[in-house]
Each structure stands twice: as C-alpha cells, then as structure tokens.
Amino acid sequence: MTNPSKRILVLVGAGASVDFGIPQTKDFTAALERELQDDQYCLESGGWEAYQWVKNTLEKYYGDEPWEAHFERVYHSLHELAAMKLIDGAVPKYKPVLYPFLKPEHALEDRALRAAAHAMLKAIYKIASTSSALSKHSLNPLTAFIKGLMENAVPRIYTTNYDDFFSQAYPGLFTGFTNKRDGYNLFNPKDYWAEWNVPGLFHLHGSVHFGFPLGGTPDPDVDIGDLAWYESREEAIKHVHGGGSGKARLDGTQLERSAIITGLDKLGRLQQSPYLSYYGGLTREVNEADLIIVLGSGLGDLHLNTCLLQARRTCPPTPIIYVGWWKDGDLREALRGDLTDQTIAMVHDLRIDICNRAQMQFGSYPGWAVNTNARAAIYAKGFYSFLQDSASFAQILKQIEA
C-alpha cells in the first residue's frame, strides 16, 4: 500500500526511452526526414525544400560541429522564421516587434516554412507513437520499479517524453484527464490539485495520447487549443492537428498550437492546458519531495533544471538519484575529460560536486558513484540496467539517507 506520508518525485528524460526503442537523435532525424519526404503536402508546398535549407544553413553556421543542427533547432528556426511575417495593414499588436531589426533574408514562402514545421510535428508524433507499440525490452522491470516506489511512498512521475512506456508498464496512474467524454477525456485542473496525494504520471511536453477533440459533435466544454486524452494511440494520432489558429505572443508573433512540445521555446508553450497545471505543480513537487529521481535526462531543459535547483539548495538538500549513461558505465573515467553541458548542470543545478574526488565514492556498487555529503548518487550504466539491479538501488538509498 502506498505510504501517503512520503513523496517521491521522478523526472523522466529522453534517455530513459532509448532502451525501450525510441530512436536516438541521429536515427530519429533520419526517420523524421523520411516522413517529410513522404508527406505530399510538405513536398508540394516547398516544405521539404525549406527544411533542407534551414538544416544546411545551421550546419554551416555550427562549422566543425554540424551535428548541433539537430531537429529541435531546425524546428525552432522554421517556426520563428514563419512567425516573423509582417502582414500589410496589421495593427501594432500583430506586428513582430523585432521585424525592423531582423528582417528575414531568404526566398522561402511563409507557406513552405509552416508546412515544414507542421510536417515535422506530425512526423515526431508518428515516430514516438509507432515506437511505443514496439518495445525493444520487457516492461516487467519498469513495472516492478514503479510498484516498488508505490510500496514506500507516493510517486509523482513527470516525463518530458511523448511515448507511453510508463503507462504501459503501470496502467491507471492519475493524469488529471478526468472529465470523460465519448472517445476521450478532458483535463480537469481542479482534480489535478485535489488528487495531490495519489500516484500520478504527467507528460510535461505532450504525449502520444494527446490530441485536439475538434470536429464531429461540438463539445461546449472544448475551447480552441484544448487537448484531450485518447486511450488509443491509433485514435489520438488522428487528432494531432486541429488546434485552431496560433496563440498570440506579446512580441507580435504567434505560437502555433500543437499536441506535443518541441523546439527551443518550451517554456512559452507550457502556458497551454494541461501543461500550465503540470508545471505549476512541479514547482511544488520539488519542494515537498522526500526523494528526487532523475531518469535519462541530459539536463538540457533549463526550465526543469531551475525547479530541481530549488530542492537541492535547501539545507539539508533533498536526496537525489541521477540515472544516466556513460561509456562502459564508468563515470570516473568520463570525468577525466572535459566537462560537458550535462556534467556542468549536474554540478550547478543538481548540486552534485562530481569534481570533488575526496567526496565522491566510486564503485561501492557496480555503476554507482555516491556523494554522501550532498545526499546524492549517480548511476552510469543506463536506465534499463538500473531497473535490473533493485538490490543495489535499495542500498544506495540508505547511504544518501533517503
């Protein structure tokens, strides 16, 4: 039975889904580009040409590091270039404020830019949905992990991933989508806060179960841009678009509505329901959690790092487990090289002093590094390997006083 007096915050990142079959960045990009080339409207409208131009321009811009032109940066560029459109006769509210300083210098039509961005979202959603149906590994260890958390505390799982491996492993976790309709559920913010002490799973950046419930019989409770939860992935993907017109931003541009959040302006998109409630709740979760577990996150989402920092700046700091992957599962060897954005964030945002060799204890258990002073532990052999070694995990929790 769940222990209501103790809370565990679990933050899930992209690396946690790779073991189950979500493609890594290189393969994901290749699959995305195949989808774009198969999208007839994208081809006819010049969207594929726009995608190639943006990607090639970014690759040249990044010089010796062309891989930095990844799909999130490409999408962001396409979206912002399309948004930087000046409409004749527009009132100041709808004139991009930076237009006179940053007039776009390209020959691409607005239609092509929007078609490319639209096709990218559709492709990303499809790849995540298809991959969710074909798990590469058994979900049993993940099921056991969630059950183990529930035996000792109230686990609140916040994931930045679109896939549904966690809900497959443990169906029925609370999501906040409690207003039942014929074929879908709508989000209820009051229920999200009322059910604060029940185990939950919350998709911070969207899900393969999210869609826009427009069309058919009008629902008086559905406004433009509202998202619904569809139990069937096959049904949800039919509703990936249809959120209506874009949402106005204060700088005179528009934010295109989408069932999933990608690109570099994630924080701006979190104002949409249910994300507004989820993000508001997350800032409370980090302060009430008795233990924080970060799974497979490269710590690239700065708005989430800011939340985690709140808990790690307390005295004493909230205990934290960080599960990642380093070559050969050897964090100590990896630290002999240059620090990366990930390891820098571990030091500054998670407050794990991994560079202090006097405090770090390596190898007390296979794959683990522990800093008892910081009440922190790092697992370096990947998420699926972590799931298969519950005995070591239990001992580590004792070491960091969690």
Stretch-by-stretch model annotation:
Residues 85-98, 102, 106-115, 222-257:
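Extended, charge-rich helix/loop segments that form flexible
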Residues 1-20, 25-35, 41-54, 194, ...:
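SIR2/sirtuin-family catalytic core signature
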Residues 23-24, 171, 215-217:
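Short coil/turn segments at secondary-structure boundaries
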Residues 48-52, 229-284:
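Acidic, metal/cofactor-coordinating or nucleic-acid-engaging core segments within structured domains
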